[in-house]
Amino acid sequence: MPMPKIADARALSDEELSQEIYAVKKELFELRLQQATRQLNQPHLIRLRKHKLAQLLTVESERKRGKSLSSTQTQKEE
């Protein structure tokens, strides 16, 4: 299973992005629970989900920063 691409995360809308973040966090929790109870057969999935979560959170923060930067720039221009 290849690493997810950040372009896929950037293609999501804000609402889809929030839903995907929630889903990945939930899946990561379940994987950690399986690991703690020694039921996890594919430990590499934890790494993949953490990587995907980091990408999603990066895109979310970029969008927030972009919106705040554009609003401060318009205030400075006035």
Curated annotation (Swiss-Prot):
One Pfam family matching this protein: Ribosomal_L29
Q: Quick one: signal sequence residues?
A: none
Q: Does the keyword RNA-binding apply?
A: no
> Which keywords has UniProt assigned to this entry?
Ribonucleoprotein, Ribosomal protein
Biological processes per GO annotation:
translation
**Annotated region Disordered: where?**
59-78
Q: Which GO terms describe its molecular function?
A: structural constituent of ribosome
Q: Which CDD domains match?
A: Ribosomal_L29_HIP (cd00427)
GO cellular component annotations, sorted alphabetically?
cytosolic large ribosomal subunit
Q: Where is the composition biased (Polar residues)?
A: 68-78
For this protein, the record's InterPro entries field holds: Ribosomal_protein_uL29, Ribosomal_uL29, Ribosomal_uL29_sf
Which family does the similarity line name? Belongs to the universal ribosomal protein uL29 family.
PANTHER family per record:
60S RIBOSOMAL PROTEIN L35/50S RIBOSOMAL PROTEIN L29, LARGE RIBOSOMAL SUBUNIT PROTEIN UL29C
- What this protein is called in its record is Large ribosomal subunit protein uL29
The encoding gene is rpmC
